């Protein structure tokens, strides 16, 4: 049931530890064998094929698409190339703030770690496995933030509840396109950018919504100041 082929060795110790602890142990041994679930077995841990030292930005999603054959193992990325409303709004924000069109398919190769809060879901039952994965996800977030401080996109309440697990946080808040140029820079900081989840309802609420969050522009400013290659969104 548990397929770990392709996982980078930098993640193997923490993954082995996590899947042998409750409640994940019960999920894999008792629940998943008896139900239809998403994504495919070989894609459950797909996100961990990236070496930890290559991560520049972590995007925390919710749980996999529960419709058969749509979940890819990476947040926001649909296996059928269907563009969800959330991803449409992400692309709109990318275009508005950077002038780029946006293509999530090229993100992983640039060091963007597309982590769902839960890595499995019962087919047709969104949110059904979130409680099983919460401890594991917290552990992964602590591990990444300690081993390789980076930039974090926390969109929505589900992602933001993991903020407490991030070491040495620097909250990117109160900046605009001019002030962001003066942001304090340290390779010891985990830069946290927060906004509502990019659903249609939150996209159009101006300063209180996803629209105008400027995360994609600000992330590139931070990367450039850290002497890292900027993201081609």
Feature roles, as predicted:
Residues 1-36, 86, 93-96, 119-146, ...:
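C-terminal capping/extension of enzyme domains
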Residues 146-152:
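Short active-site oxyanion
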